[in-house]
Design a protein with these regions (language model features):
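Hydrophobic/small residue at the entry helix of a nucleotide-binding pocket
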Residues: 13-16
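Helix N-cap at the beta1-alpha1 junction of Rossmann-like dinucleotide-binding domains, i.e.
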Residues: 36-40
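Rossmann-fold cofactor-recognition segment
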Residues: 51-69
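Conserved Rossmann-fold cofactor-binding substructure of NAD(P)-dependent oxidoreductases
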Residues: 65-81, 93
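N-terminal glycine-rich "phosphate-gripper" loop used for MgATP/nucleotide binding
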Residues: 67, 84-95, 105
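Rossmann-fold NAD(P)-binding glycine/threonine-rich loop
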Residues: 103, 112-144
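Residue-level detector of conserved catalytic or cofactor/ligand-binding positions
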Residues: 143-152
Length: 152
């Protein structure tokens, strides 16, 4: 079964992630991009089409989302039948997106540790401060210099 993907964040990393997902859309299902500015998501989608990044015809859609709004994120995940959420938005949204994934059963992939806006530059262990508290409840994958759970 193909897995529908929601990419949260439409900056530089979101652009790269969306193109990589498009290059593997034979294995993935629908690809959705969401950010506070859906026009940025649409620009990424347009660049995917312009470069011919899709392996085969597929669903690519842009959505407006305030990822700090757990209810809105949860609703979008359910509405689109999302299986995998790739969070490449601001580090301040990690816990809200993770909570929405826990509540919906979606797998959560991330590229950065969570930062609390009131506690920037916290002391290590950074992952243990936030995300690792939930590692037994869901699938959490960190992409980058460190990775936690290996369950997928």
């Amino acid at each position: 079964m193909k897995k529908n993907v929601l990419i949260i964040g439409a900056g530089g990393v979101g652009h790269v992630v969306a193109h990589k997902c498009a290059q593997h859309n034979r294995k993935l299902g629908a690809i959705h991009l969401a950010s506070r500015n859906p026009a940025k998501c649409q620009q990424i989608i347009d660049s995917i089409h312009a470069r011919g990044s899709l392996q085969e015809p597929g669903i690519l859609e842009a959505h407006a989302l305030d990822a700090l709004d757990i209810d809105a994120t949860r609703a979008l995940i359910r509405q689109l039948d999302i299986h995998i959420v790739i969070n490449v938005g601001s580090a301040f949204v990690n816990m809200a997106v993770l909570r929405a994934c826990l509540d919906t059963g979606a797998a959560y992939l991330d590229t950065a540790i969570h930062e609390d806006p009131a506690k920037i530059c916290e002391q290590p262990p950074w992952y243990a401060n936030y995300e690792w508290k939930y590692r037994d409840e869901c699938q959490i994958i960190k992409i980058g210099r460190a990775s936690c759970r290996e369950r997928v």
